[in-house]
Design a protein with these regions (language model features):
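Membrane-anchoring hydrophobic helices of lipid-metabolizing enzymes
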Residues: 1-85, 90, 120-121, 129, ...
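Residues that cap or flank secondary-structure elements
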Residues: 6, 62-63, 86, 112-113, ...
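Hydrophobic alpha-helical segments typical of transmembrane helices
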Residues: 14-17, 94, 116, 120-121, ...
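Non-catalytic C-terminal accessory region of glycerolipid acyltransferases
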Residues: 24, 32-35, 72-77, 100, ...
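Catalytic core of membrane glycerolipid acyltransferases/transacylases, capturing the structured
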Residues: 77-136, 161-166, 172, 197
Length: 283
């Protein structure tokens, strides 16, 4: 993936996103991050066949978990929580780390368009030990899980069309408020969860303190905005710490936030594009 990935048209999303995160990086530094991100993605895809080894600490693989002592959901089994993460390292693994705290969780996943491949990945995910619910445009499945007292886990660093513009790396990104709204509705905790690739197939999952609104007297919409803004700040910290472990193959910011300098940098960064040629092609 580190060789072929940067040649794909999708890599221009990587370049634009990294140019926003690291505006002072030159073309070579940006391209190095693109390669690192593709390598991490390739490793994560290969690890589906070995999720059982990772989940159970076999053959040199495993998960080290660091847990905040402030999470009530872990000490009060009847209390659900909303766990949120980003497309970092192997983003399937936080669910297993939560299950290892003797806390059941339902992981929300995006089904693939290929039914056969989707079924294969679904079988591999069984090693995580959690319930699996396909993502939907409706929040009803999430409400059903929380109503039944089950925690949910969501990946929420994507740009969404129906979200709120909240800062991420100094620029507004359309951010979903759904996790915070659900936490407020069910009076449960909103908990950021980070995963890092430490070495090969060894990982560290950090379960942070629950996120609270800045103003407890604000209305619920404003509380949700404040909470998700804090989640975005967590994402900023994680991405700066391990940028090559961030999968950002989709647009994170609106096109209009890319100014002329960004576009100039991106064009210079892509060594697989030549004037007069046919643009990016897979090797």
């Amino acid at each position: 993936c580190g060789l072929v990935g940067p040649r794909l048209p999708k890599s221009n999303h990587f370049r634009r996103n990294f140019a926003v995160v690291f505006p002072d990086h030159g073309p070579e530094q940006i391209e190095n991050l693109v390669r690192e991100s593709w390598r991490n993605f390739g490793a994560s895809m290969a690890e589906y066949a070995h999720l059982d080894d990772i989940a159970h600490g076999k053959r040199g693989a495993g998960i080290e978990t660091v847990v905040s002592e402030k999470i009530r959901a872990f000490s009060e089994p009847e209390r659900p929580a909303v766990f949120v993460g980003a497309h970092m390292a192997n983003w399937e693994l936080p669910a297993r780390a939560i299950v290892d705290q003797n806390h059941p969780v339902t992981a929300i996943f995006t089904p693939l368009q290929n039914p056969g491949l989707d079924a294969l990945l679904h079988r591999c995910r069984r090693a995580l030990g959690c319930r699996l619910v396909p993502a939907s445009e409706s929040v009803r499945p999430l409400i059903a899980e929380l109503s039944a007292g089950r925690s949910i886990g969501l990946i929420v660093d994507q740009k969404v069309e129906t979200g709120e513009p909240l800062p991420l790396f100094g620029r507004d990104k359309m951010t979903t408020l759904v996790p915070a709204r659900l936490a407020l509705r069910f009076d449960c905790e909103l908990v950021p969860v980070q995963v890092q690739r430490i070495d090969g197939s060894r990982f560290r999952v950090t379960i942070f303190d629950p996120v609270e609104p800045d103003d407890p007297h604000a209305n619920n919409t404003e509380k949700a905005r404040q909470m998700m803004a804090k989640v975005n700040r967590h994402f900023e910290s994680w991405i700066r710490e391990n940028p090559g472990q961030w999968y950002c193959g989709n647009r994170r910011w609106p096109k209009r936030v890319s100014n002329a300098e960004d576009i100039k940098s991106i064009g210079a960064t892509n060594p697989h594009t030549r004037s007069g040629g046919s643009g990016n092609r897979a090797a």
